[in-house]
Swiss-Prot record:
Changing residue 2 to R: Abolishes its ubiquitination. Normal protein targeting to vacuolar lumen. It is an enzyme of class 3 (hydrolase). The active site is at 644 (proton donor). GO terms for molecular function: alpha,alpha-trehalase activity; carbohydrate binding. One of its GO terms (biological process) is trehalose transport. Belongs to the glycosyl hydrolase 65 family. This is Periplasmic acid trehalase ATH1. Its EC number is 3.2.1.28. Changing residue 27 to R: Abolishes its ubiquitination. Normal protein targeting to vacuolar lumen.
Length: 1211
């Protein structure tokens, strides 16, 4: 029988024998095999019995044959339904609507304690409902405590008083020389300045570069800052007291609050000044729709309750200032005042770019509260580099408040190219914008807020169980949106986005791979136009990339590592002998836009935008690689992979895998478009060398030894975002790579690392929950309070982190974190397959969801854009659902087959290359049975508009059989090493760990088994890294069902009671009903324990789980029974290493996954007794404290504590 080829099978035919309920848990499906048997049984039926039956069977045969042909076509691509570990068959049904996720109030409340693990959160706050971040601490100016405003074109970092320009004056860690500086390459003093998109200067030399010799062949390009447009100041009593960032001291300020609304991008600052006599409130915003408009609102009022008895009036001079000294790397073109319009203006040019300038035009309205009469400026000043208007007002008890609205038009040459009135000068347009806005504050504010609200209607992420993660998702969206725009972007220039956006000159404001690989993909599913604008910048600089290749004698094109105004090869951005992978990154970003397929992205885009970039990159790499006749493979040389700790190496793994993948893209796209395809591309793609150790661990580069410390994700990038895996052998190697390199990341490395591990773990591991522990590891060490901005480093102290002054804010991390949710936890990937007959590319969406035990209730991605359709992606506790909510075109979805994954089949080194140790780390797994057939493909679906596809979530197995603690909630009661998170100790991954900050003091982890899930611990195991502890103790909090019920009910009562009297009465009745006596005492006689330490543990527990309850206990003595003491069931058990130390590891020649040390223990309850003799109910517990102290080898210079990889507790 001739097989009919069809890439997509018919959705209706696919589910004729399935239960169409959207809930798939515990549903049975007969599968393809049973349907094949039915077909064969029909074909053997005796047709002679009845002519009528013959006719009926004839018709039925036609129908069944059609089904069989469709089935055969499917089987060409997938036998995934035969996998015993996971049934990927889904149900397509009419859309059920919004899919509200379950809300777990206890998990949500507990998650709020995670904020306290953020750096500098002690005086910060977050209003969840209104999305407001803020601080009550008036501090000296330091970058991490400053918010900013931006709209994708203009931006300004806001100092402590709420407006103006300020240099940093505080470093938390040291006052060493350079402590207040930014990092490479400028190494200049950090400042709260103002910036304009694409306003680049040219510098003959920079303070720090990688290739200074290239300064002789081309200037470097870095961002210039413009005069600070938020600069308002006021002075009192003949200018004897000034209110500006330079003159306001810590002692002058009380009742301080500064907050950032992520709903609308407004920064509000309020404070009392001068013995609380004056109240100052400011609001700053960059108009979301009118990009060249910045607005400052300032209210100055008398606090009448704090005025002296002889107070009469207060003279105030308000200064609207433009000061050239607040800009950097610019030349002053002109400055002046416009007395007719009460305005000041200034024009600056970026250094060495006379063809560009930026004009700033500022005008104010000044009115008393409840007055309609504006006050005109009384004086104007024009100095050499400062222009100002002065408004004199008198505050009295009858007129106690003055309101200033400052409207600033900002126009640069780069933005003016997009305007219809291109003949207008920049100053003319800036003036028009400011004057048209003047006096329309409320109307402008309303339109500004509406523009922000409209943006959020296009994108939303829900994580109901975790306030911190949801806030981080929201803040990441906010920060990326604040620094990009989807219109008013020149198509022939695009949108260059620097690492720190529009509020900082970190990394010189230059464009790195951060824009292509980290930020753009995070925006693409929600804001494809913004992503395309960012990619258009690479299109605009493509012609220069071709000149770069020509300069070095290569065909094709070579992008430099850094770009700005131009994309020439510079000392910061060399084109050769450095990070060649940038060419893969740019190509991947462009191809991803095609695979996403938003409006207008079709074969024309592929032919005229993506194809030239990929073709030229393929041409360059074809000439660059060298054939090694001894290996019979192609090699690369003298390069740097993403791990910048290793420079000038050969055969970088990610670079070579990128070349392999890119050459495949070039072949596939060329064939699809009917273009000429170089046969050499396929040959090199097939035969490029990826270095591996004898144990099949991918080496980051040729000659790598085991002493390596990795700066950032490198080899793991082959899994995501590159998608290098294309057969089972590579998949198995990738799993080993994930394990190996997870233990070799620098503790102080950049925040772009662990989002990649989230995606890799979710896609590669069938056990544990490390995809979620990596998610926390992506946030907790890097996110900075109070304004939820990411730092580049987990440790901001340049004296302890390798002399790195972190970029801030680090938008790269915002993009990475969003990708870890959008693509990591959901398993979503843009993908394609090639029809083997026509060579045509067919775009599809891969969906590979897993259960998320650390995130009860799941996650929801609202308004995901794909193929110009709008989707909701829902991961709840049992099912994954894609809802086709808007659009009129079906989409193609593929569910991969996870039966290929063998994440436990790891053989460990045993001191000999020829003998492998039996798998000591092999974790017990409950297998239903081995898969009937390995299949690298999956199951395909066609999802039509107003339908939804629901698939059963893959349920990862337990790492260790019957481990009651795995995937449960955990918190560290003592400090850990920067970059470590406690979740790693229970995540079912033997290659993640938590490590105490020091080895001297006792370190503690507190585990919560969950509500109504108390267990009696009988035995367990601690899996150590190469650094075991000296001893271990375990304590439990004796618990009972009565206590559990009271615990939950008291919390509910607290949330619903309206006043203290009602609260006390209700709790009293609850305790009476439960039989709790007025004087409730629990007998702990006979138990030797450290009372103070036990009480501290209880206090920590209450603070973690129920902070309000801890306060309530102090008010209601009868609740003291909840302060049960922890009972020590394992006391200072000494630890002995279970594994030898291999000499090959010491001499750095060993590239192996080493077996871990372990300590097993059993609990002897006969030596313990609590309460009445014979009573064993106390042994059950929900809360456990695991304490470790010291390290086994206490003679090294490392002050950090033991490495705890996994805690296993059995009942």
């Amino acid at each position: 029988m001739k097989r009919i080829r069809s890439l997509w099978f018919n959705a209706e035919a696919s589910y004729s024998n399935l239960n169409n309920s959207p809930s798939l848990r515990n549903k049975n499906s007969t599968g393809n095999n049973s349907r094949s048997k039915n077909y064969r049984s029909f074909s053997r039926f005796d047709l002679i019995n009845s002519i009528l039956l013959l006719m009926m069977l004839f018709l039925l045969a036609i129908f069944v044959t059609a089904l069989y042909l469709t089935k055969s076509s499917r089987l060409t691509y997938s036998h995934a339904s035969r996998a015993a570990l996971f049934n990927p068959l889904g149900v397509i049904s009419p859309s059920l609507g919004n899919h509200t996720l379950n809300y777990d109030p206890e998990a949500r409340e507990s998650s709020k304690k995670l904020y306290e693990l953020l750096s500098d959160f002690n005086t910060a706050y977050y209003d969840d409902e209104n999305m407001i971040l803020g601080s009550n601490l008036f501090s000296k100016n330091t970058y991490s405590r400053q918010p900013y405003v931006a709209n994708g074109y203009i931006g300004s970092r806001i100092p402590n008083i709420g407006f103006g320009y300020a240099l940093d004056t505080l470093n938390f860690y040291t006052d060493a020389p350079g402590a207040l500086n930014n990092g490479w390459p400028l190494r200049n003093h950090r400042f709260a300045g103002a910036f304009v998109s694409d306003f680049y200067c040219l510098q003959p030399k920079l303070n720090s570069t990688n290739f200074p010799e290239l300064d002789d062949v081309g200037y470097s390009t870095v961002i210039s800052s413009i005069p600070q447009w938020t600069n308002l100041q006021f002075s009192l009593v003949n200018d004897s007291k000034w209110f500006n960032p330079q003159n306001v001291t810590l002692d002058d300020v009380t009742n301080y609050s500064q907050n950032l609304s992520m709903k609308d991008g407004i920064v509000t600052t309020e404070l009392d000044w001068l013995n609380s006599q004056i109240h100052v409130k400011s609001e700053i915003w960059a108009h979301r729709h009118i990009h060249p408009l910045g607005v400052v609102s300032l209210e100055i009022s008398l606090n009448t309750d704090h005025l002296p008895s002889d107070f009469d009036s207060l003279d105030v001079n308000i200064w609207d200032i433009l000061d050239f000294n607040t800009s950097h790397r610019t030349v002053l073109h002109s400055t002046g005042t416009d007395e007719k319009n009460n305005a000041v203006f200034m024009i600056v040019q970026p250094d060495n770019v006379p063809s560009s300038n930026c004009a700033i035009y500022s005008t104010c309205t000044v009115k008393y509260e409840n007055s309609t009469n504006p006050i005109n400026s009384s004086e104007s000043f024009e100095e050499k580099d400062v222009s100002s208007n002065i408004y004199n007002v008198i505050l009295t008890e009858d007129q106690p408040k003055i309101i200033v609205h400052k409207y600033v038009g900002i126009m640069s040459t780069e933005f003016n190219k997009n305007k219809e009135q291109q003949d207008n000068t920049n100053i003319g347009l800036a003036k028009m914008i400011a004057l048209n806005s003047k006096g329309n504050y409320e109307k402008l504010l309303s339109s500004h807020k509406r523009a922000w609200y409209d943006l959020y209607n296009d994108a939303f992420i829900e994580i109901p169980s975790d306030s911190l993660l949801e806030m981080t998702a929201r803040s990441s969206l906010f920060h990326l949106l604040a620094n990009t725009r989807d219109y008013n972007v020149s198509s022939d220039r695009g949108l260059p986005v620097g690492v720190s956006g529009l509020s900082s000159d970190s990394y010189g404001g230059m464009v790195f791979w951060d824009a292509d690989i980290w930020m753009e993909p995070a925006l693409l599913p929600f804001f494809p136009n913004v992503a395309q604008n960012m990619n258009n910048y690479r299109n605009a600089t493509h012609s220069q990339a071709k000149l770069n290749a020509e300069k070095y004698g290569y065909p094709g094109a070579i992008y430099p590592w850094t770009s700005g105004k131009y994309a020439n090869c510079t000392s910061t951005g060399p084109c050769v002998d450095y990070e060649y992978h940038i060419n893969v990154d740019v190509a991947m970003a462009s191809f991803s836009i095609y695979l996403n397929g938003h409006e207008g992205i079709d074969d024309e885009y592929l032919r005229y935008t993506t194809w030239p970039i990929i073709k030229n990159a393929a041409q360059f790499f074809t000439a660059y690689v060298k054939y090694n006749s001894s290996l019979g493979l192609y090699e690369t040389y003298n390069l740097t992979d993403p791990d910048e700790f290793a420079n000038h190496i050969n055969n970088g793994a990610f670079t070579n895998a990128g070349i392999k993948t890119l050459l495949k893209w070039a072949t596939d796209i060329g064939n699809h478009l009917g273009e000429v395809v170089d046969p050499k591309w396929s040959e090199i793609s097939k035969d490029i060398y990826i270095p591996r150790s004898s144990s099949n661990i991918t080496l980051e580069y040729s000659g790598m030894n085991s002493s390596v410390e990795i700066k950032q994700a490198d080899v793991t990038l082959m899994v995501y975002p590159l998608g290098y895996i294309n057969d089972e052998s590579i998949l198995n190697n990738a799993i080993k790579d994930l394990y190996y390199y997870s233990e070799r990341q620098s503790a102080s490395g950049p925040a772009m690392t662990y989002p990649v591990f989230v995606a890799a773990a979710a896609g590669l591991l069938n056990h544990g929950s490390s995809s979620q522990s990596y998610l926390y590891k992506s946030v907790l060490p890097y996110l900075r309070a109070p304004f939820a901005q990411f730092s580049e480093q987990s440790d901001d102290n340049f004296l302890t982190n390798g002399l790195t002054q972190p970029a801030f804010p680090f938008l790269t991390a915002n993009g990475g974190f969003l990708q870890s949710i959008l693509f990591g936890l959901t398993g979503i990937r843009y993908s394609y397959e090639v029809d083997p007959d026509t060579k045509k590319i067919n775009r599809l969406l891969r969906f590979n969801p897993i259960e998320l035990p650390l995130l009860p209730g799941g996650i929801a991605i609202r308004n995901f854009k794909y193929m110009n359709q709008v989707l909701d992606i829902i991961i709840d506790d049992h099912n994954g659902t894609i809802v086709h909510k808007s659009g009129d075109v079906p989409i193609h979805i593929k569910i991969p087959n996870r039966s290929l994954i063998h994440d436990q089949d790891i053989n460990f080194y045993n001191g000999s290359e020829n003998e492998r140790k039996p798998n000591l780390e092999r974790r017990d797994v409950d297998r239903v049975g081995d898969p009937m057939r390995m299949d690298r493909y999956g199951t395909y679906y066609l999802l039509k508009p107003k339908q939804e596809l629901t698939v059963q979530l893959f349920k990862p197995g337990l790492n260790a059989r019957n481990n009651i603690a795995e995937n449960k909630q955990i918190t560290n009661l003592t400090a850990g090493v920067p970059g470590d998170v406690a979740f790693s100790a229970l995540d079912g991954n033997n290659y993640t760990h938590w490590q105490p900050l020091d080895k001297i003091h006792r370190a503690k982890l507190l585990i919560d088994l969950g509500e109504y899930n108390e267990k009696e611990i009988t035995k367990g195991m601690i899996l150590w890294g190469q650094r075991p502890a000296k001893n271990i103790s375990i304590s439990i909090l004796p618990h009972s069902e009565k206590v559990e019920n009271l615990f939950a009910n008291v919390t509910e009562i607290m949330q619903n009671s309206g006043n203290d009297q009602l609260l006390n009465e209700t709790i009293g009745q609850l305790l009476d009903n439960a039989g709790i006596p007025v004087e409730n005492v629990i007998d702990f006689d006979g138990i030797e324990q450290e009372d103070d330490e036990s009480l501290d543990d209880v206090q920590a527990l209450l603070h973690w789980k129920k902070e309000d309850l801890a306060k309530l206990i102090e008010q209601i003595p009868r609740l003291n029974f909840l302060k049960r003491k922890f009972v020590k069931i394992l006391d200072n058990v000494p630890v002995s290493p279970s594994e030898p130390y291999y000499e090959a590891s010491r001499n750095q020649s060993l590239i192996e996954i080493l077996p871990s040390n372990r300590t097993t223990f059993t609990i002897d309850y006969d030596k313990l007794q609590v309460g009445d003799k014979g009573n064993t109910d106390w042994r059950k517990t929900r809360y456990i404290v695991v304490a470790v102290q010291g390290v086994y080898d206490d003679y090294d210079d490392d002050n950090k504590g033991a490495t705890i990889k996994e805690i296993v507790l059995n009942d």
